A protein has these predicted regions:
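Extended effector regions of multi-domain proteins
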Residues: 176-179
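Acyl-donor binding region in acyl/amide transferases
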Residues: 11-166, 173-174
């Protein structure tokens, strides 16, 4: 069906230090990230075979991660980069980031992007009340639909998979080395 790359971060830190983490090429970590690194799994790239696109294959990948976590309860945190295609219109990227910054902000400054995405512009933030997640999500979907696009699958999955407060977007940045 597909695969998700992940690595136990404490083990990787013991072997290769902080430079052994892919996310460290994208983010500088603060002290508040230490407990996450000690009990975390860094999620990397994933793929789904084309024959399974459009099915519940991503759910199966999540079930596999869940089964791993059930057998290894020492891991409490999943973290990693999630991309937004550069093929999306700039306005769509700005709206997505404004929405996710508003509703899923970092509770503590645990990581800072090495290549920060510009702060959300007031005209993008004004699209959302910040008071009603479901109404603002509906608004985001409509705005993106007008631009001919939709919320990227992993953004939807991450925010819907976890219980309230269970997902945070620590920072937003660009990865000059990442190709669409």
């Amino acid at each position: 069906v597909g695969a998700y790359r992940f690595i136990p971060t404490a083990e990787q830190l013991a072997r290769k230090g902080i430079n052994g983490l892919y996310t460290h090429t994208l983010f500088d970590y603060g002290q508040q990230m230490e407990h996450v690194l000690a009990q975390g799994l860094e999620l990397g790239r994933s793929f789904i075979q084309p024959a399974y696109w459009g099915r519940r294959s991503l759910d199966y990948l999540w079930q596999g991660i869940g089964a791993f976590l059930a057998r290894h309860p020492q891991y409490r945190y999943l973290f990693g980069p999630v991309s937004i295609s550069a093929g999306l219109p700039l306005a769509a990227r700005d709206l997505l980031i404004a929405f996710y910054r508003l509703y899923f902000p970092a509770s503590v400054p645990a990581a800072r992007s090495r290549h920060p995405y510009p702060a959300s512009l007031p005209q993008h933030l004004q699209q959302f009340s910040g008071q009603d997640y479901h109404a603002d999500l509906t608004r985001l979907k409509a705005l993106l639909d007008n631009l001919g696009c939709a919320i990227p699958t992993l953004y939807k999955q991450y925010s819907e998979l976890c219980e309230p407060g269970g997902v945070e977007f620590l920072d937003f940045g660009t990865d000059p080395a990442f190709a669409d």
